[in-house]
Amino acid sequence: EPLSQSEEARKTASTVNHIISRITDILDDQPKANTVLLRGFSKHPTIPSMQELFKLNPAAIANYPMYRGLAKIVGMTVLDVGTEMEDLFDVLETQYQNYNFFYVHVKKTDSYGEDGNYADKKKIIEATDKFIPRIQKLNPDVIVVTGDHSTPCVLKSHSWHPNPFLLVSRYALPDKAVRFSER
């Protein structure tokens, strides 16, 4: 059902419902899937950019299309990047003087969690950790390492669990934490 009664909303809802119905009919006898879940129907939201709100010149370094799109919505310049993790940090280093805020997204931690692949999730976190010294050499005011949600391997799904949060800054007071953990 459309969320509003505008002609545009009714037309979109009708089209989407027709597409879902056709796909469901086509998949009717398939053993692995019987329908499709479509999401993300909306207009580009009008929200203030990071430049307007915080006077930043932000850049996003991400491969996954959803995160690239979200970055654009909040006014970040989305930088081209290769497919390897090292590419993320190479771009950060080469573009560091051109921006004053960077969002660097490592997708595989989430993907391995959804696959239930603990060994590879651990490896990708450890591999990411090895790039921290490269970031520190750039001498940023702040480094934050966290996740947008938890994806425990045991659940193979996003969850309500807390995210570890690491903040390093010469302007922040240290705490007593000695490890980066969800506990």
Which residues does each PLM region occupy?
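Feature captures the catalytic ectodomains and active-site-proximal regions of enzymes
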Residues: E1-R183
